[in-house]
């Protein structure tokens, strides 16, 4: 329980940020500017919401917890123009918030239980995003930034790095939250590539190849991609079919996807 009488709800994955030093450091990393079009996902009790409002004067926020949503609207009434959407961020169309000539900046202390599906949801709307700053489970950030050859490199690494430059910023200890989570967190900055690394490759096509490859990561690439590409085709692309999926670079996954698309 806390000062507003709201117990953190496990089903929402709630851990409320309360460490002022962390909040200030996160604010410096985001560096909000007066004309920014910004949305906060999962504002909770408003630890970041209030300083963002002080900097911007206006803010969009998405909060699924109805009680917290009502509390935030009341608490921020005299602090600035907070437009709160009491909806599920996993199904929210962020394009409704973007303006024709202004992209959206997205920030948030994301619940651990939805962080990966939410990232994929946002990647599907990458064209309207300026950048993203998230507090995530440290393990997730490690996977986002992982390079080929390591155990952390996988589908999430390839897909996010296809869309964004990944910049891990700093670790946040569990004691910065109430209640404290069982693991540490990390703040990460995601900046969309402009122009796209491969404008002719769709999300669906790359995801099809990468998902199939990593669904059987212990197998060789030739076995993992059976039905999509043959060993001979891999060799023609200069890729050793005996390699394992976690050793293949993003550039090679793009080459595999281009080849597969041409063969359709």
UniProtKB/Swiss-Prot annotation:
It catalyses: adenosine(1518)/adenosine(1519) in 16S rRNA + 4 S-adenosyl-L-methionine = N(6)-dimethyladenosine(1518)/N(6)-dimethyladenosine(1519) in 16S rRNA + 4 S-adenosyl-L-homocysteine + 4 H(+). GO terms for molecular function: 16S rRNA (adenine(1518)-N(6)/adenine(1519)-N(6))-dimethyltransferase activity; RNA binding. SMART domains: rADc (SM00650). Gene3D superfamilies: Ribosomal RNA adenine dimethylase-like, domain 2, Vaccinia Virus protein VP39. Pfam families: RrnaAD. InterPro entries: KsgA/Erm (IPR001737), rRNA_Ade_diMease-like_C (IPR023165), rRNA_Ade_Mease_Trfase_CS (IPR020596), rRNA_Ade_methylase_Trfase_N (IPR020598), rRNA_adenine_dimethylase (IPR011530), SAM-dependent_MTases_sf (IPR029063). S-adenosyl-L-methionine binds at residues 15, 17, 42, 63, 88, 109. Its EC number is 2.1.1.182. It is found in: Cytoplasm. One of its GO terms (cellular component) is cytosol. The keyword NADP does not apply. It comes from the Bacteria. The keyword NADP does not apply. Keywords: Cytoplasm, Methyltransferase, RNA-binding, rRNA processing, S-adenosyl-L-methionine, Transferase. Specifically dimethylates two adjacent adenosines (A1518 and A1519) in the loop of a conserved hairpin near the 3'-end of 16S rRNA in the 30S particle. May play a critical role in biogenesis of 30S subunits. Belongs to the class I-like SAM-binding methyltransferase superfamily. rRNA adenine N(6)-methyltransferase family. RsmA subfamily. This is Ribosomal RNA small subunit methyltransferase A. It comes from Nitrosococcus oceani (strain ATCC 19707 / BCRC 17464 / JCM 30415 / NCIMB 11848 / C-107).
